[in-house]
C-alpha cells in the first residue's frame, strides 16, 4: 500500500508539467476546445485551476477573493503561484490541504476543514477560490463537499450542480466515496439537531 502511494506520488510529479501545459493550452485555445480557467459556483465560491500570479489582481480586486483553498502539494505551486506569505500581504488567507495529483482523494478531515474555511468567508460576504492544478478533480471534490453542507444535497446532486457550470470536472470513484462519507456525517449531525431537510432538486 505504501509502495503504491509512493509510486502514484512519483508519477504525479513526473506528469505535472506536461499536464499543466495541456491545461494552459485548453485555457488559450478558441472554440469548442476552450476551457475557462475558473468559474463562479455561487456567491461565495469560485472553482478553478492554479491561481497563477498573473490572475492575482483579477481574483482579489474583481472577484473579492479573500480566501484560497489550495488542494495541491507544495511543489505544484512553488514557482507559479503566490506563497502563503504573499497572499497574506494581499489580505488573502490561504488554506493548503495537500492532496496527490491524478489519483489523490481528499481526506474526510480535510473536507471538513475546507468547508468550514469557506463558510467563514461566506459569513463575511467575501469569496473563496478553491483550486488544484486544473480545477477538475481534487478541488471539485472540495466544492462538492461545500455544496453538500450548504444545501444538504446528495453527493450526486452536488456534482451535477458543479458540472452544469464547469462541465469538464472529473470526480473519480474514490472521491465520490469520500463525499458519501461526508454526506453521511452531515446527515447524521443534522438529523440529531433536527435541521435536516431532504433536497427536492
UniProtKB/Swiss-Prot annotation:
What topology does the record note for this protein and the membrane?
Peripheral membrane protein
Function statement: Lipid phosphatase which dephosphorylates phosphatidylglycerophosphate (PGP) to phosphatidylglycerol (PG). PGP is an essential intermediate in the biosynthetic pathway of cardiolipin, a mitochondrial-specific phospholipid regulating the membrane integrity and activities of the organelle. Has also been shown to display phosphatase activity toward phosphoprotein substrates, specifically mediates dephosphorylation of mitochondrial proteins, thereby playing an essential role in ATP production.
Q: Does the keyword Lipid metabolism apply?
A: yes
Name the GO cellular-component terms. mitochondrial inner membrane; mitochondrion; nucleus
Record lineage: Eukaryota, Metazoa, Chordata, Craniata, Vertebrata
CDD domains linked: PTPMT1
Q: What are this entry's molecular-function GO terms?
A: phosphatidylglycerophosphatase activity; phosphatidylinositol-4,5-bisphosphate 5-phosphatase activity; protein serine/threonine phosphatase activity; protein tyrosine phosphatase activity
Q: What is the effect of changing residue 132 to S?
A: Probable loss of catalytic activity. Does not affect interaction with STYXL1
Q: Which residues form the Tyrosine-protein phosphatase domain?
A: 37-188
Instruction: Tell me the residues of the organelle transit peptide.
Output: 1-27
What Enzyme Commission number(s) appear in the record? 3.1.3.27, 3.1.3.16, 3.1.3.48
- Which family does this protein fall into? Belongs to the protein-tyrosine phosphatase family. Non-receptor class dual specificity subfamily.
- What is the gene name? PTPMT1
Q: Which InterPro entries match?
A: Dual-sp_phosphatase_cat-dom, Prot-tyrosine_phosphatase-like, PTPMT1, PTPMT1-like, Tyr_Pase_AS, Tyr_Pase_dom, TYR_PHOSPHATASE_DUAL_dom
Which Pfam families does this UniProt record tie to the protein? DSPc
Its main subcellular localisation, reduced to a broad class, is: mitochondrion
Kindly state a single biological-process term from the GO annotations of this entry.
regulation of intrinsic apoptotic signaling pathway
Question: Quaternary arrangement and interactors, per the entry?
Answer: Interacts with STYXL1; the interaction inhibits PTPMT1 catalytic activity.
Native source species: Homo sapiens (Human)
Catalytic activity reads:
a 1,2-diacyl-sn-glycero-3-phospho-(1'-sn-glycero-3'-phosphate) + H2O = a 1,2-diacyl-sn-glycero-3-phospho-(1'-sn-glycerol) + phosphate; O-phospho-L-tyrosyl-[protein] + H2O = L-tyrosyl-[protein] + phosphate; O-phospho-L-seryl-[protein] + H2O = L-seryl-[protein] + phosphate; O-phospho-L-threonyl-[protein] + H2O = L-threonyl-[protein] + phosphate
Catalytic machinery residues: 132 (phosphocysteine intermediate)
Q: What is this protein called?
A: Phosphatidylglycerophosphatase and protein-tyrosine phosphatase 1
Where is this protein found? Mitochondrion inner membrane
Which terms are listed as keywords in the entry? Hydrolase, Lipid biosynthesis, Lipid metabolism, Membrane, Mitochondrion, Mitochondrion inner membrane, Phospholipid biosynthesis, Phospholipid metabolism, Protein phosphatase, Transit peptide
Name its pathway: Phospholipid metabolism; phosphatidylglycerol biosynthesis; phosphatidylglycerol from CDP-diacylglycerol: step 2/2
